[in-house]
Amino acid sequence: MQAKKRYLISLLTGAFLVLLIYLGGGGVPGPAAPGSRSRTHGYNRPDQPWPHFSDPLQHFSPWDHSDTEDYNVHISPRQKRDVNSSVYKGKRCRMQSCFDFSLCQRNGFKVYVYPQQKGEKISESYQNILSTIEGSRFYTSDPGQACVFVLSLDTLDRDQLSPQYVHNLKTKVQSLALWNNGRNHLIFNLYSGTWPDYTEDLGFDIGQAMLAKASISTENFRPNFDISIPLFSKEHPRTGGDRGYLKYNTIPPFRKYMLVFKGKRYLTGIGSDTRNALYHVHNAEDVVLLTTCKHGKDWQKHKDARCDKDNAEYDKYDYREMLHNSTFCLVPRGRRLGSFRFLEALQAACVPVMLSNGWELPFSEVIDWNTAAVIGDERLLLQIPSTVRSIHQDKILALRQQTQFLWEAYFSSVEKIVLTTLEIIQDRVLQQSSRSSVMWNSHPGGLFSLPQYSSYLGDLPFFYAKLGIKPSPKFTAVIHAVTPLVSQSQPILKLIVSVARSQYCAQIIVLWNCDKPLPAKQRWPATAVPIIVIEGENKVMSSRFQPYESLISDAVLSLDEDTVLSTTEVDFAFTVWQSFPERIVGYPARSHFWDNNKERWGYTSKWTNDYSMVLTGAAIYHRYYHFLYTHFLPSSLKSMVDQLANCEDILMNFLVSAVTKLPPVKVTQKKQYKETMMGQSSRASRWADPDHFAQRQTCMNKFASWFGGMPLVHSQMRLDPVLFKDQVSILRKKYREIERL
């Protein structure tokens, strides 16, 4: 009897345990997956979200079983790992392990673009990228000379629901003869993944290729291998682009609004958590965060109690007006980590407040975003208003100014985004001559600071003030000679004597671009400074701006052979240049204007109240611009100058103004600077040719087209000696001869 009771009790106990496990076993945690990462450590990192706890309780609102679309579905960690492993099989790729440096050592940093395949569609944005590369100094049409390869297959939009999606890309890429598992290849991408989770799935194995990708996460980003680029719209200009909207600084730097945002709310799904919580910090006064539920075709099926109020308030405000009148602009994540709001805020000089955990910010390898943005945390949304209010006005002003620099240097056009990407890769390849962080984050930026010239900041005129360096105490005169020496009274000989008497002259270089042989050494005047005669190889106009090794001084006095300048005028121009070492300083001024009737740019030599160019027939500038002219400008523009034997001075002014964003500096009232006795048969008489002036009009528009806009800046300033024309004794004046001219 006792045994039967024991058996019965054991049986009931076992049945009860089985029933308990069956009914409640779903809540018992199982062993961790082998590939899962512990979150015990590093819980304060902003790029890791809070742990996700599933709610076993029933929802307060009844579930509508008629909804066939599950907006809150989330793929499992295993599925996410599978997706990432299929896309990032080269997860551990770095330049040292997945890049062949030997391809770059043979021919330098050259980029090859695959020929476009017949029948393949290419989006306008991707065509802009390819056109930029093909028009850059990095491009080569010979794959045997290439260091980096770019696909002609459109990889920008890899959302399977997009009409721009290219099908069968995996097969097409693998069939490329030069693919080599993606080694030394660069892939551009703006959109990846699709509804509902928008994973970073490109739909094909990138192998060992580098990714230039928008909205890339820090989890998938391969440091010093991939490049994070900004998300830009198809309307983003290919070249040029509008300048930043900051016209002047206000002190204190506060605007009408402290913090603004206007955008979609995303009722459900990825990206909705933060945007659904914005109403908690919205006060409709200085913090205006507006969202609308009107997104997608079925938004009304998922609207909540706040939607009607949010939609009504959303329509009351103009987005552009908010953008231009706010101190800070909130940039929360969307469906993907990046959004168009980022570039819009930069251009508007509205300091971005980043609220997108885990986003690798654009060009983070070289740009210090702490100097231009506020990096927030989605989990600390309620602290954002108090955080931005605590920022001192000096810091706000510095942040605002840096947004304008970064926008104009790297983001205002597709061309700048692409060239910045290529320059970053080039710095990795040529580490011995790479740019410093100061070059990337200071005016004029990395695109205009070529490390092939020098990686030392003190060799570039833009950093003299920052480093406390004084400009060069001497100059080198470069005289462009195009007519033979037939008389000892020719203007070039008088010019050499006059320049050589300057106390600041280190040497004189005569660039012999004449068809006649070089004159004998004794034909040149005896001077206290050395005279170096260089015979141009091709005898073309662009040769006057070659970075000759003989240029030992930073300052270059550029002169035409028929220029008439006294020693006093040379001295005064040089002393003025020492105060403006990054600009062109000189005598002959010209201007540009917009012709409304012809709808084109015009060139004028009329004496007006302003000017935008100082011609290089009598001007001083830094020798670095010789290097930029030769190595930065495309061969198409230089070939045009050489064929016309004209416009080289205009092109140099375009280049310097594009770099500095400043006008040149004219000195003294002198307007005529040419020798009138030059023979009409000489090549110098081209100034009297009516076609010469017409050609310069054509050049203006050709140059403006390549620069993507008009870089020239007008000025109404002219610098004269302090006592110029003053009613004092002539003996008290330092540059007394200038008044007699």
UniProtKB/Swiss-Prot annotation:
Residues 29-741 are lumenal. Signal peptide: none annotated. The gene is ext1b. One of its GO terms (cellular component) is Golgi apparatus. The keyword Magnesium does not apply. Gene3D superfamilies: Spore Coat Polysaccharide Biosynthesis Protein SpsA, Chain A. The lineage of its organism: Eukaryota, Metazoa, Chordata, Craniata, Vertebrata. The chain crosses the membrane at residues 8-28. It holds the Pfam family Glyco_transf_64. Glycosyltransferase required for the biosynthesis of heparan-sulfate. It is an enzyme of class 2 (transferase). This is Exostosin-1b. InterPro entries: Exostosin, Exostosin_GT47, GT64_dom, Nucleotide-diphossugar_trans. It catalyses: 3-O-{[(1->4)-beta-D-GlcA-(1->4)-alpha-D-GlcNAc](n)-(1->4)-beta-D-GlcA-(1->3)-beta-D-Gal-(1->3)-beta-D-Gal-(1->4)-beta-D-Xyl}-L-seryl-[protein] + UDP-N-acetyl-alpha-D-glucosamine = 3-O-{alpha-D-GlcNAc-[(1->4)-beta-D-GlcA-(1->4)-alpha-D-GlcNAc](n)-(1->4)-beta-D-GlcA-(1->3)-beta-D-Gal-(1->3)-beta-D-Gal-(1->4)-beta-D-Xyl}-L-seryl-[protein] + UDP + H(+); 3-O-{alpha-D-GlcNAc-[(1->4)-beta-D-GlcA-(1->4)-alpha-D-GlcNAc](n)-(1->4)-beta-D-GlcA-(1->3)-beta-D-Gal-(1->3)-beta-D-Gal-(1->4)-beta-D-Xyl}-L-seryl-[protein] + UDP-alpha-D-glucuronate = 3-O-{[(1->4)-beta-D-GlcA-(1->4)-alpha-D-GlcNAc](n+1)-(1->4)-beta-D-GlcA-(1->3)-beta-D-Gal-(1->3)-beta-D-Gal-(1->4)-beta-D-Xyl}-L-seryl-[protein] + UDP + H(+). UDP-N-acetyl-alpha-D-glucosamine binds at residues 435, 544, 560-562, 648-649, 696. Its cofactor is Mn(2+). The active site is at residue 649. It is found in: Endoplasmic reticulum membrane. Its main location: endoplasmic reticulum. Disulfide bonds join 647-699.
